[in-house]
Every structure is written in C-alpha cells, then in structure tokens.
Curated annotation (Swiss-Prot):
Record keywords, A-Z: Cytoplasm, Histidine metabolism, Hydrolase, Iron, Metal-binding, Zinc
Any one Gene Ontology cellular component term annotated for this protein: cytoplasm
Gene name in the database record: hutI
Keyword Cell wall biogenesis/degradation on entry: no
Annotated positions binding 4-imidazolone-5-propanoate: R100, Y163, H193, Q260, T336
Name the UniProt record assigns to this protein: Imidazolonepropionase
C-alpha cells in the first residue's frame, strides 16, 4: 500500500468497496500453498488509478487527502460491490473457423477420437476450415469470443495458433489474434499442434517449423511464446525438446502441452528447460510433482477439457500440497473443450479436484499471471500493477459456485472501463 506521485491528468477513484480482494498475499507467495488469508481482504476499501496503473489501495478511511479531491479524480461509487483482480485466462485456442459439434455427437455414440481423425476429423477438420477462412472472418469471430471472456471478468487472455499448420495461415492466425481489442492478449505459436497432411513424420515437421516458421514469427513479432503438444503417438519428447531449445535461442518463452494422455516426459522437459508452464498434467505422478514443486513452472489445469473427453482429472490436490503453483483455464477450443465458461472451470476444480475457493481464485489470477510471465503486471491489486479490475454485486464466496451465475459485473482493463455500467 501507499501512494505514488499523482500527476495532474484525470485519474479514477473506486470508492465504497464493500470487500476488496487484493491477492497481495497470494502474489507474495508466488501462488503457492494458498490459504484464505492470502486473498488479503480489505473491508470498506478504495482504489486509486493513474495512467492505467494502481497508485493507491487500502481502507477508504485512510485515503490520502490528495486523492480525495474531486478535481483530481473521477469517482466511481462501487455501492458496496466486491472488487478483485481481473481474471487471467492463460490457455485458449480462441482463433479458429467452424465447429466440431458433429464430432462431439459421434464421440458420444462411441466413435473413438482415432476413428474420427482417420475420417478427416479432429484438428485436421478445423485446419481445413481455418486455412480457408479470411483474416477478417477470423478477427470477427475472435473478437466476439474475446468479448464473451471480458463479460465474465477476464482482463488477460492467452491465444494460441495451431489450427493452420502451414506458414501462411499460421501467420494469419497470429495476425488475427493481434488485431483483437479491448483487453490484454498474449499470442502463443502452437504450430506443433498436430501433423499436417503435407508431412509424413513429426520430426520432419518440427524441423520445418524450427527452420522456416519460427524465424518468421520472431522477425514479425507475432508471438512471444512457443508451445508444443508432447505426447506418445504425436510430437516425440526428444525432437520436441530440440525444437523448444531452438525457440529459446530465438528469444521465445516456452510452454508445453504435457502428460495429458500418457506420462510422456512433457513435464520433466518443462522443468529442464525452464518453461513457463506445463499444461494438462493428468498423468503426472509423485516424481514429476516433486520436480514441478521445486521449479518455477506453473501447472496449468484444464478441467473442462477433462470433462468433455471423459478422462480423469489432474492430481491438483497432490500438486498444491507439494508446493506446485497452479493456474486454471478453459482450454477453449472447438474440439475437446468448446466452452468459455469460467464458472464451470472453477466449479469442476472445486468438485472434482478438491481445490478450495481461495485456491481457485488465486489460480485464476496470480497463477495465470505467472503462467504468462505477467506476474509483475497483473494478477493482484497492488501499487504499480495494471488496473485490471473486476467488480461484482455479490459476496466473493459466491464465485465459482453456480454454473449459471449471473452477477452484475463491471470490468476495468488498464484503468479503462470495458464492460458493465456504473452510475
């Protein structure tokens, strides 16, 4: 807490906040072993915003006089609302064309994923539609989806490519993601998502990506992160590790779709290379959990994908108790998690993965911020951080409690109101 210099241009005062969840304690613990006290609750609080940043946060009765002057700040009366950091949605496949609803019905009728893929379905089905889609159409669909995330209180969204699987159209996907507006977005290059029909082996395709695509993505600054789907029968560990090392040489941050279907070494590679995150992690065991706990790798858990694919859930309780920092996300994609519902993610985390509500809130704020290497900017409400703020008209304990929850929300991104109405 404490003031920074307030310059002369108009700032914002959020006052009459009933309960403020700053998450300062969770941020100080880097998102590990979260307890309720780490939400750092303040009653009857206020927040001051200047130049898109938080410059003061604390009990309203302690608001410095220079911030209380009407001429200096625009007042927003929270009227007893609850205020917390905007959610960080750290794993999505937001840019794509078409849907895979017919495949969903086929899976429910007993057709295997492998059979669907053999018939030209799966990721390759989305690939065909995405390659054929115009940049403008991808932007329009992506903006609509992004706005839906914003309406739920999300202020940062990660967006992966990976549904084009060639140079021209992977760049098109990343360009579409860059054109989205309203909140902070983070691009990830996921060319290593599936094997396109133009290639016969995963190793040859990884070589193509490393030699022909990564340098172009780096030069055009279309993404700052590189992801790969390491799995038995898909991208092999050894070739994937070589590919990720090349990405690091080019200046990319790295992350891994790891140990989703089998224990295939993805999480261990993540630790060895210093990846930002290992995502999915359904199959990891005690040895992998211990290594993750001793590292800076964030475990990104995606329970709606597990729900849709009817698989087991990751061992979240064992991970958290061992000291692994975890994040939660939707894995929004047209095939295995066609949902943007944050409440469902959090509810599954509580019901199926035995996470406490404070752990879920921290995972969707501080944990997500670490997964994106944005922990110094977002995830908690502290002086100097971005004014990414969610205001709700309900008690904080109603968060991630009802799938159909419909609280009235107001959302600020970088100090600008981007959703909701305040009088």
């Amino acid at each position: 807490m404490g003031p920074m210099c307030l310059n002369r241009h108009m700032g914002i005062l959020l006052k009459n906040i009933s309960t403020l969840l700053t998450l300062q304690g969770a941020a100080a613990k880097q998102g590990r072993r979260i307890k309720e006290e780490d939400l750092s609750l303040l009653q009857q609080a206020a927040v001051v915003i200047e130049k898109n940043k938080i410059v003061w946060v604390g009990p309203q009765k302690k608001l410095p006089k220079e911030f209380a002057r009407k001429k200096a700040l625009r007042d927003y009366d929270m009227r007893g609302r609850t205020v917390l950091p905007g959610f960080v949605e750290c794993h999505t496949h937001l840019i794509f064309a078409g849907d895979r609803a017919a495949e969903f019905e086929m899976r429910n009728q007993g057709v295997s994923y492998q059979e669907i893929a053999a018939k030209g379905g799966g990721i390759l089905s989305t690939m065909k539609k995405t390659r054929a889609s115009s940049l403008n159409d991808l932007v329009k669909a992506g903006q609509r989806r992004l706005d839906h995330f914003v309406s739920q209180g999300v202020t940062t969204v990660e967006i992966k490519s990976g549904y084009a699987l060639n140079l021209k159209d992977e760049l098109k996907m990343l360009q579409a993601a860059q054109k989205l507006s309203g909140i902070r977005t983070v691009n990830t290059f996921l060319g290593a998502h599936a094997l396109p029909p133009e290639f016969k082996s995963y190793e040859d395709y990884l070589t193509f990506l490393a030699d022909e695509v990564l340098p172009v993505v780096a030069k055009k600054k279309l993404a700052r992160r590189v992801d790969v789907f390491i799995e038995k029968g898909f991208f092999p560990p050894e070739a994937s590790e070589k590919y990720l090392r090349r990405a690091q040489e080019l200046g990319f941050e790295i992350l891994i779709h790891a140990d989703q279907m089998s224990l295939s070494g993805g999480s261990e590679i993540a630790v060895r290379l210093g990846a930002l995150s290992g995502d999915h992690l359904l199959q990891i065991e005690d040895k992998e959990i211990r290594k993750l706990a001793q590292s800076e790798v964030t475990g990104v858990l995606l329970p709606t994908a597990d729900l849709y694919t009817k698989t087991k859930y990751p061992p979240a309780r064992a991970m958290i108790d061992a000291g692994v920092r975890v994040a939660l996300a939707t894995d929004f994609n047209p095939g295995t998690s066609p949902t943007q519902n944050l409440n469902l993610v959090g509810l599954l985390a509580r019901l199926e993965m035995k996470m406490s509500l404070p752990e879920v809130i921290a995972a969707y704020t501080v944990g997500g911020a670490h997964a994106l290497n944005l922990q110094n900017e977002v995830g908690s409400l502290e002086v100097g951080k971005s004014a990414d703020i969610l205001c709700i008209d309900q008690d904080w304990q109603t968060l991630f409690y009802s799938v159909g929850e419909a609280s009235e929300k107001v959302v600020f991104s970088r100090g600008k109101k981007v959703f909701g109405t305040l009088k």
